[in-house]
């Protein structure tokens, strides 16, 4: 694999690491401020919809549809044609999103009723959750305009990525985290309902992200004046690819929205427990899988345009191997150390030992699907780079159906934990079907060394998990320690686990050069 691709991956991972660390700090601040009660449930609900749209546009459908077309124009056209494409895309997309944003703000009550049906039912009948419905409707009015800002932020980031400027778009989410932290520290004390300050932070964070990237577009002479271009050939191609991709890429996020709706029928705290467990999974998912996906999509699109199927398959194989290298130990490590991680990160203020235990249960269920969700981020570009958006949609529909069935099977005996387990099961099915499709089409064939490589990773990960499980005390002991001592103990154990993993890999014969090629 080329040094340029590896270097790009390292840059994106580094910038993403900064963003994810700030995201964890933000969640620590939120846990301290709101805990896992009524206010937390309502804020996480109100933030779920714009957050879903962020995934959809910043890491999903728009990027998957736009980058291959942009790459094609860059290769086959001159700069004027590229700028004309960008103007048409910006104007058309901007017009549509402006209308959607206005409808979302004006219809926040309808959206709240749709995705928070349990709260809406109580509101209609004067039940105990009526206050949640009213507060969620108000907060959604504040957070929904984030969609408008993040749409153009995503477009700017996709343009920069096609020019090899990966660091800017990867670092941009840091500003959302900073503004939300600032809102919690400085605006919340001034308000009767501190959760509203966080909604204001989401709005301001979208604005700051929107403004940050545009000077970099000017540097590459790609800052254009938007104009309506519904019938522009490039726009036609992008929307043809994007409409099915809106569904195909966002299956896991749609499943989370469904889980949120069902959790509104459960006891207070269910939405918060699911949120905190999901946030911990987002760290390895964003740091590793999204970073790898970000750099391989333009590379795959170029290899498809160049008609180089062998190198296309090798690039995909490299992406899968990197996800396995980082995803297997992350999955096992989080599963084993979930309680101490939650304790150290969130147990302060309104978030106590009970909340740690409850969040830990859903985190364990969610972790079973972490590797599959990471693989989806690498396998899906194998379709979108070839401008095939229909196959992921068909697979996504099957995955969503599986999620619904699992929800019905698991929610009664397991409650909110069953919802987390359903998402994990549907994600695993999604990844398996994506791989099967690529293999049957002879688009991606793993190298003969990849199977052995992955088996060695599994052995090293299991041994690492065994060491951590043996050395880690129970939750009561973690809770009895001071924050300082618990943090030191956790850092030492995680460092030891990483060392065990690395040493076992070396003993099994894996060397750094194997990360650049198909060797084992």
Residue ranges of predicted features:
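Membrane-embedded alpha-helical bundles of multi-pass transporters/translocases
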Residues: 1-520
């Amino acid at each position: 694999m080329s040094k340029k691709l590896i270097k790009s991956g390292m840059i994106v991972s580094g910038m993403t690491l900064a963003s994810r660390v700030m995201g964890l700090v933000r969640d620590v601040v939120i846990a301290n401020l709101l805990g896992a009660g009524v206010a937390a449930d309502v804020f996480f609900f109100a933030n779920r919809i714009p957050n879903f749209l962020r995934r959809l546009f910043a890491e999903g459908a728009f990027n998957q549809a736009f980058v291959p077309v942009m790459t094609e124009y860059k290769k086959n056209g001159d700069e004027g044609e590229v700028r004309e494409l960008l103007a048409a895309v910006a104007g058309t997309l901007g017009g549509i999103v402006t209308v959607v944003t206005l409808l979302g703000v004006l219809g926040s009550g309808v959206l709240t009723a749709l995705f928070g049906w349990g709260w809406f039912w109580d509101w209609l009948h004067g039940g105990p959750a009526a206050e949640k419905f009213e507060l969620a409707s108000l907060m959604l009015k504040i957070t929904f305009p984030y969609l408008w800002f993040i749409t153009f932020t995503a477009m700017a980031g996709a343009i920069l990525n096609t020019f090899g400027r990966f660091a800017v778009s990867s670092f941009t989410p840091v500003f959302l985290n900073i503004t939300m932290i600032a809102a919690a520290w400085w605006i919340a004390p001034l308000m009767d309902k501190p959760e509203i300050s966080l909604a204001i932070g989401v709005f301001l964070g979208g604005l700051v992200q929107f403004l940050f990237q545009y000077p970099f577009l000017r540097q590459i002479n790609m800052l254009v004046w938007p104009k309506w271009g519904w019938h522009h050939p490039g726009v036609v191609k992008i929307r043809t690819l994007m409409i099915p991709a809106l569904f195909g890429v966002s299956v896991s996020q749609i499943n989370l929205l469904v889980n949120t709706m069902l959790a509104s029928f459960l006891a207070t705290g269910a939405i918060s427990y699911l949120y905190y467990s999901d946030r911990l999974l987002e760290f390895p998912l964003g740091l590793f899988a999204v970073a790898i996906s970000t750099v391989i999509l333009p590379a795959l699109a170029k290899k498809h345009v160049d008609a180089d199927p062998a190198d296309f398959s090798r690039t995909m194989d490299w992406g899968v191997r990197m996800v396995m290298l980082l995803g297997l130990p992350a999955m096992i490590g989080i599963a084993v150390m979930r309680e101490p991680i939650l304790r150290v990160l969130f147990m302060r203020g309104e978030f106590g030992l009970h909340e740690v235990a409850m969040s830990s249960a859903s985190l364990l269920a969610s972790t079973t699907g972490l590797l599959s969700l990471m693989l989806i981020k690498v396998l899906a570009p194998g379709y979108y780079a070839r401008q095939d958006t229909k196959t992921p949609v068909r697979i996504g529909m099957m995955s969503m159906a599986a999620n619904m069935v699992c929800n019905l099977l698991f929610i009664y005996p397991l409650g909110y934990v069953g919802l987390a387990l359903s998402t994990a099961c549907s994600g695993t099915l999604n990844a398996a079907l994506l791989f099967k499709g690529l293999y049957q089409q002879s688009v991606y064939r793993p190298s003969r060394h990849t199977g052995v490589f992955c088996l060695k990773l599994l052995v090293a990960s299991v041994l690492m998990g065994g060491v951590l499980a043996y050395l880690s005390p129970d939750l009561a002991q973690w809770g009895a320690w001071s924050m300082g001592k618990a943090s030191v103990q956790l850092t030492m154990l995680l460092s030891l686990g990483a060392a065990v993993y690395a040493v076992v890999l070396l003993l099994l014969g894996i060397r750094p050069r194997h990360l650049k090629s198909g060797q084992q």
